[in-house]
């Protein structure tokens, strides 16, 4: 296959991913674990609801709300669809003063003319924007290995503020054309971090981050972790619909629900590191988001629920969904007597079920529950 064909394949694949997310049920068949996390209701909150402050600080910036619009797309065929999605999300992020990411910029690195599909500064001059490259592209065994040049291009071409490195071994392992070269990625990221002038966020894409991986990432200076846990969109599920043969379909189906649930991943990363956490993975309501914040996350990240209005260019539709989450978070905070996110991390939590069973075998659960702040 020639170079041109490989470039086109990347762009076409991005379009197929969007299409399947919109038209198919690509949700995990299991929950993200937050049903096992319980707030203790306070009949006397001792605060006024309208005094609750939802602002958070992250990588030197202050944001009005603890919600992160997760990266979804960019570089799709014709670029128009991806551009519309990203600009719609960016307008919403600009209005609410919350951060957002773009989808993988691999297509842009290969075909620079697709850069406009990621560019949102014309509609969102102040938004905190996170670029996005894949971890396998930094492997020592991959052809056309990425380094400082590509990382700078990803950030500076779209005037981003930080770079996410997405770790998606599950998706790549079940994708027909997947990149399964991961040897030497940690060393490459350590070298990149030593030279790179922007923050780097390590990001999973639906299978969660364990405390072992989190500790390694913290040791090389990574600035934050997006846990991207199990319980939301299954990228193995997406690849099931893209598979070309029965073996490929069977493989993707078998691993549809592989991974670490989001709630568990948040707890492990918070227990083992002092890094800021973005809790993505099946975040579909403000109560679950408030639980993630109480467990130590700085943001709850959301993607798929915003995709349908974003495809239509419906900025108000995106904002409406986000405002619903915001009000649900605020209400949960009121009912546990938390004036701000810092206080929310100190309210009592009760963890039950599978999540408790897992965490009791993996961490000192009582110690974690006593100290959930950064």
From Swiss-Prot:
Pfam families noted in UniProt: FMN_dh
Any one biological process term the GO annotation gives: isoprenoid biosynthetic process
Top EC category: isomerase
Enzyme Commission number(s) from the entry: 5.3.3.2
Major localization class: cytoplasm
Positions with a binding annotation for substrate: 13-14, 104-106, 171
Location within or outside the cell: Cytoplasm
GO MF annotations, alphabetized: FMN binding; isopentenyl-diphosphate delta-isomerase activity; magnesium ion binding; NADPH binding; oxidoreductase activity
Residues annotated for Mg(2+) binding in this entry: 172
Reaction catalysis annotation: isopentenyl diphosphate = dimethylallyl diphosphate
Keywords: Cytoplasm, Flavoprotein, FMN, Isomerase, Isoprene biosynthesis, Magnesium, Metal-binding, NADP
UniProt keyword Cytoplasm, yes or no: yes
GO cellular component, one term: cytoplasm
Required co-factors: FMN; NADPH; Mg(2+)
SUPFAM superfamilies, per database record: FMN-linked oxidoreductases
UniProt-annotated binding residues for FMN: 71-73, 104, 132, 203, 233, 282-284, 303-304
Role played: Involved in the biosynthesis of isoprenoids. Catalyzes the 1,3-allylic rearrangement of the homoallylic substrate isopentenyl (IPP) to its allylic isomer, dimethylallyl diphosphate (DMAPP).
Family under the similarity heading: Belongs to the IPP isomerase type 2 family.
Subunit structure: Homooctamer. Dimer of tetramers.
Protein name (record): Isopentenyl-diphosphate delta-isomerase
Source species: Thermococcus kodakarensis (strain ATCC BAA-918 / JCM 12380 / KOD1) (Pyrococcus kodakaraensis (strain KOD1))
């Amino acid at each position: 296959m020639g170079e041109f064909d490989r470039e086109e394949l990347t762009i076409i694949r991005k379009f197929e991913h969007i299409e399947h997310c919109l038209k198919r049920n690509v949700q995990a068949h299991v929950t993200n674990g937050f049903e096992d996390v319980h707030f203790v209701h306070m009949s006397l909150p001792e605060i006024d609801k309208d005094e609750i402050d939802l602002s958070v600080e992250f990588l030197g910036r202050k944001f009005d709300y603890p919600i992160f619009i997760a990266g979804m797309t960019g570089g799709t065929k014709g670029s128009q669809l991806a551009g519309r999605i990203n600009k719609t999300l960016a307008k919403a992020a600009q209005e609410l003063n919350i951060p957002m990411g773009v989808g993988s910029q691999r297509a842009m690195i290969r075909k620079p003319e697709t850069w406009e599909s990621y560019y949102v500064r014309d509609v969102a001059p102040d938004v905190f924007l996170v670029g996005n490259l894949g971890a396998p592209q930094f492997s020592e065994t991959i052809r056309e290995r990425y380094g400082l040049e590509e990382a700078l291009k990803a950030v500076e071409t779209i005037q981003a503020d930080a770079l996410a490195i997405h770790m998606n071994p599950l998706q790549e392992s079940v994708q027909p054309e997947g990149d399964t070269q991961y040897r030497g990625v940690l060393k490459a990221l350590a070298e990149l971090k030593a030279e790179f002038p922007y923050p780097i966020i390590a990001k999973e894409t639906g299978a969660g981050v364990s405390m072992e991986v989190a500790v390694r990432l913290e040791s090389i200076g990574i600035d934050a972790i997006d846990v991207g846990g199990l319980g939301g969109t299954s990228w193995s599920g997406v690849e099931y619909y893209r598979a070309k043969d029965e073996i490929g379909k069977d493989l993707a189906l078998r691993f549809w629900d592989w991974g670490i649930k989001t709630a568990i991943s948040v707890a492990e990363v918070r227990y083992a590191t002092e890094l800021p956490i973005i809790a993505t993975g099946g975040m579909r309501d403000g109560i679950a988001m408030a639980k993630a914040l109480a467990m130590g996350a700085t943001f709850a990240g959301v993607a798929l629920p915003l995709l349908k209005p974003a495809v239509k260019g419906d900025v108000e539709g995106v904002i409406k969904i986000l405002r619903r989450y915001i009000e649900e978070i605020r209400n949960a905070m009121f009912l546990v007597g938390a004036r701000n996110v810092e206080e929310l991390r100190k309210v009592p939590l009760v963890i039950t079920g599978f999540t408790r069973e897992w965490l009791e075998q993996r961490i000192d659960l009582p110690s974690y529950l006593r100290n959930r702040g950064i």
